[in-house]
């Protein structure tokens, strides 16, 4: 069996539905991955865990402070997080959360060129764009907005194996020096997430999935 495909310069999209409907919906936009005003790095691998586990994980970053306190923005370690503003359409779910002015992490201040003792409003955004694409944004609102975009392309290989291509994009400090600082931090973090998800899948295989 063959499927309609479309290449957009970043991904190859496969339409698994009715072939005649493939032209009715364009693939989601990921223009920042190809935009010279953004710098992007990332990697890809197979995670021995089902697609649903990865989707659930990326839909809630409040656990980042527990997985890796060093990488987490300090505001995520608070006990009184602001509420999520959620919007739902027929094809996507998106949320945003605005944080009051607060400190940024030491690595953030380094690459963003911001004082560690400064207080900056911060905005978290996330969107389930398509079953195979999750996008997060984290913006620090200083003299100019400094934004990270985290793009997760997910390909189900089996019910227990998922291909994961992750990318981290930024609209500031576009040079190699910042990338040399950032890549080891995020590569180590996502490898840690991979190991945790694989451990969770192993537990599910043994004990079953608890919907509660």
Regions found by a protein language model. Name each.
Residues 1-13:
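Active-site-proximal cofactor/substrate-binding loop regions of enzyme domains
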Residues 20, 24-212:
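C-terminal catalytic domain of Rieske-type non-heme iron oxygenases
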Residues 10, 17-20:
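Short loop segments at secondary-structure junctions
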Residues 13-15, 38:
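Tryptophan-centered motif/residue detector
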């Amino acid at each position: 069996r063959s499927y309609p495909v479309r290449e957009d310069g970043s991904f190859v999209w496969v339409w698994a539905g009715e072939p005649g409907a493939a032209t009715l919906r364009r693939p989601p936009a990921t223009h920042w991955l190809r935009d010279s005003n953004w710098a992007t790095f990332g990697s890809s691998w197979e995670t021995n865990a089902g697609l649903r586990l990865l989707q659930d994980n990326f839909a809630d970053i409040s656990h980042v402070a527990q997985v890796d306190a060093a990488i987490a923005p300090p505001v995520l370690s608070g006990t009184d997080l602001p509420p999520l503003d959620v919007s739902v359409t027929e094809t996507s779910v998106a949320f945003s959360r605005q944080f009051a002015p607060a400190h940024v992490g030491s690595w953030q201040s380094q690459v963003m060129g911001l004082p560690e003792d400064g207080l900056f409003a911060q905005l978290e955004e996330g969107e389930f764009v398509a079953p195979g694409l999750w996008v997060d944004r984290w913006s620090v609102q200083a003299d100019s907005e400094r934004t990270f975009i985290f793009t997760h392309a997910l390909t189900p290989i089996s019910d227990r194996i998922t291909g994961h291509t992750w990318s981290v994009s930024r609209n500031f400090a576009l040079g190699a020096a910042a990338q040399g600082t950032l890549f080891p931090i995020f590569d180590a973090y996502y490898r840690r997430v991979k190991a945790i998800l694989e451990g969770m899948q192993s537990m599910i295989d043994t004990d079953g999935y608890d919907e509660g």
